[in-house]
Curated annotation (Swiss-Prot):
Single GO cellular component term: cytoplasm
GO biological process: CTP salvage; UMP salvage
PANTHER family in alphabetical order: URIDINE KINASE
Predominant cellular place of this UniProt entry's protein: cytoplasm
Organismal lineage: Bacteria, Pseudomonadati, Spirochaetota, Spirochaetia, Spirochaetales
Protein name per its UniProtKB record: Uridine kinase
Entry similarity comment: Belongs to the uridine kinase family.
Alphabetical UniProt keywords: ATP-binding, Cytoplasm, Kinase, Nucleotide-binding, Transferase
Organism of derivation: Borreliella afzelii (strain PKo) (Borrelia afzelii)
């Protein structure tokens, strides 16, 4: 069975940076982003401004779980792709063929027990709120076609609440908590050394 490494934390915490660091020490892996499992806004009966993207129900949790379960059993999946500009799932999918290591990242991946039980190594990225907000603001404006006001309104109305209600409490499930996100060189060194030693020993059977 494939080994799954889960990386969670609030939006803008530095999950992508940590994934990049891990990739230097794992020769072969596939990356699954929970963001691709958002439900289309068209699936809701109300407009985008009232959709709470920082709630577990915003995700297609059943599909996400089934896909991770299949990958863990070394079965391929057709992963959805999410369009953040139009807030809809794209018609095309991506064929994902499992590798010995699966890296999964997302803000809510530790919320559901059934998903947690599939993850062999859980990493939580703990980054100060102001840093996360600035990163999210820059990303959403430059890459997702958002306005300054819409990002601020979303943060005040749903994002901040969702973080304290659903995301931060999942730290208790983490095997490793990395403060300061992807810029904590000491923590990343410890993590990379651990993963490198495992790969030299012939795999990640330890986790």
């Amino acid at each position: 069975m494939a080994k799954i490494i889960g990386i969670s934390g609030g939006s803008g915490s530095g999950k992508t940076t940590v994934v990049s660091k891990i990739s230097e020490f794992i020769p072969e892996f596939v990356l699954i982003s929970q963001d691709n499992y958002y439900k289309s806004v068209g699936d809701y009966e109300y407009e985008f401004s009232k959709v709470n993207f920082d709630h577990p129900d915003a995700f297609d949790n059943n599909l996400f779980y089934e896909h991770l379960k299949n990958l863990k059993k070394n079965s391929p999946i057709d992963m959805p792709l999410y369009d953040f500009i139009n807030h809809k799932r794209q018609l095309k999918t991506v064929l994902v063929v499992p590798t010995p290591v699966i890296i999964v990242e997302g803000i809510m991946i530790f919320v559901e027990e059934r998903v947690r039980n599939l993850i062999d190594l859980k990493i939580y990225i703990d980054t100060p709120n102001d840093i996360r907000f600035i990163r999210r603001l820059r990303r959403d404006i430059s890459k997702r076609g958002r306005t300054l006001e819409s990002v601020i309104d979303q943060y005040l109305n749903t994002t901040r609440w969702g973080y304290y209600r659903f995301i931060e409490p999942t730290k208790e499930y983490a095997d490793l908590i990395i403060p300061e996100g992807g810029h904590n060189d000491k923590a990343l060194y410890v993590l990379s050394t651990f993963l490198k030693s495992l790969s030299k020993e012939g795999g990640l059977d330890f986790i």
